[in-house]
């Protein structure tokens, strides 16, 4: 496989508007052939999706999804640029897929890692810094270990970082990029809410055996 230089990555990014990591993947998959890399990105629906991301996405739709058994429900808003695209099959499929993704990810609380508040980051840092397995390690090593753990934890909280439930080889971010590339518009997941039946309700625990015994005594 040909070496993938920084210049090749930059040139491909300038040409297609795709992200740096996507360009690296494309060049690695095509042995550094720039023309084939462009085709690879287009096949994946990634080429030019990044350039579209600067345009205003004020249209779109709010969708609801109720999981089988009616124990989990999701409300989600995804934006695009035009009402025409919002009503199209491809955008509606994205709405359904991302709604199902939220339903399947009970630990996800934010759209992206950028949305996670500083206090959450500091809390996670404090937890990791206090772990026993860091005792005795040099400070510089400790910091690197903690940063890695925090990064992993924050990704677990972010919807866009999750492996897509229908194709774990891509993330939700890549799914959205692919859709944006195919429909030719900026597409943004704006917000979501996940509901779980009975969440937040305190259920009084009872001693079933004691209840049966008391019923017999009363009888």
Curated annotation (Swiss-Prot):
- Span list, region Involved in Mg(2+) ion dislocation from EF-Tu: 82-85
Swiss-Prot/TrEMBL keywords: Cytoplasm, Elongation factor, Protein biosynthesis
Q: Could you name the Gene Ontology cellular component terms for this entry? A: cytoplasm
Reading the lineage from the top rank, the first entry is Bacteria
Q: Does the keyword Cytoplasm apply?
A: yes
Primary localisation category: cytoplasm
Gene Ontology molecular-function annotations = translation elongation factor activity
The record's subcellular locations are:
Cytoplasm
Q: Which CDD domains match?
A: UBA_EF-Ts
Biological role? Associates with the EF-Tu.GDP complex and induces the exchange of GDP to GTP. It remains bound to the aminoacyl-tRNA.EF-Tu.GTP complex up to the GTP hydrolysis stage on the ribosome.
Q: Which family does it belong to?
A: Belongs to the EF-Ts family.
Q: What is this protein called?
A: Elongation factor Ts
Q: Gene that codes for this?
A: tsf
